Regions:
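A Zn2+-metalloprotease active-site environment signal
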Residues: 2-282
Length: 282
């Protein structure tokens, strides 16, 4: 009897796939898992944040206005008296709108006027909402301004600002566990309330704003002017009117069409209310 070693196949324990391909597949799998976990945490964190009583949110925030420092300096030579008059006017109009919007008990919008040139408005934590001079001076009527304020009050009523913070904090916690540094992400939380919300939240705020404007003025004329103005501002900057799929806000054309449809139900001679306090162009 004789013994001999059989030839060993060279392909044993050798993958036919390159090491680079295996590495890329592993990275892709990890990225998908992180993305799914982030999405779940964002939704869950936002849902849980909405359960925080508004009184608790208000007491924790106090007089701080999150996101105000992100708007830029604006005109440093602005007239303080003019600023105070406009802010008081915004507060008066916000209070009138809040009275017809069935706000939760204890929720009262607090309006602020920012000396920033960029046309913008947003709601933030604690019932605060901000309107910039760049937006205010472009408003052709009080009706248009009321739509802006009512839209932001609609976000406050739905607790969208605290939901955005809750979702962002949950994702930041995940990133901190993975990267070991969550402190660098904390300053970004305030920015979340200025970046917009989901398209569903925006449509809900649009509906609330239209209902409030109609309740206050008896018609929705002038509402469509808001989105025309925003579209004109973005046009020269090259931002255009992108598809709603790639934007947190519904496309301006779609929003203008909805506002025009609502305004069409009003009498042709329904008057627009002029702004009660004019703004210098600066």
């Amino acid at each position: 009897m004789s013994y001999e070693n059989p030839p060993v196949p060279h392909e044993v324990n050798v993958s036919r796939e390159s090491t680079l391909a295996q590495f890329l597949r592993l990275c892709a799998g990890i990225a998908v898992c992180i993305a799914l976990a982030s999405a779940v945490l964002w939704v869950a964190g936002g849902w849980l944040a909405r359960l925080v009583p508004y009184s608790t949110e208000r007491s924790m925030v106090g007089a701080r206005v999150f996101g105000l420092d992100l708007l830029g300096e604006g005109d440093a030579d602005g007239d303080p008296a003019d600023h105070a008059r406009i802010e008081a006017y915004l507060q008066s109009l916000a209070s009138r709108l809040g009275a017809v919007m069935d706000l939760p008990e204890g929720m009262a919008p607090i309006a602020h006027f920012a000396e920033a040139d960029l046309p913008n408005a947003f709601a933030t934590l604690g019932g605060h909402l901000i309107v910039t001079r760049g937006l205010y001076r472009r408003m052709p009527s009080e009706n248009a301004l009321a739509l802006v304020l009512a839209h932001e009050i609609g976000h406050l009523r739905a607790r969208d600002p605290i939901s955005a913070i809750g979702g962002g904090a949950s994702v930041a916690l995940l990133m901190a566990l993975l990267a070991g540094d969550g402190h660098a992400l904390l300053p970004q939380f305030a920015r979340l309330v200025t970046l917009g919300y989901s398209r569903q939240a925006e449509r809900r705020a649009d509906d609330a704003a239209l209902a409030a404007v109609i309740a206050l003025y008896g018609h929705a004329r002038g509402s469509e002017a808001v989105f025309r103005i925003l579209a004109e501002h973005r046009g020269p900057a090259g931002l255009g009117d992108g598809p709603t799929l790639f934007s947190t806000h519904p496309a301006d054309a779609a929003r203008i069409a909805r506002m025009e449809a609502a305004a069409a139900t009003a009498d042709a001679d329904a008057a627009l209310t002029p702004l009660q306090v004019a703004a210098d162009a600066h």
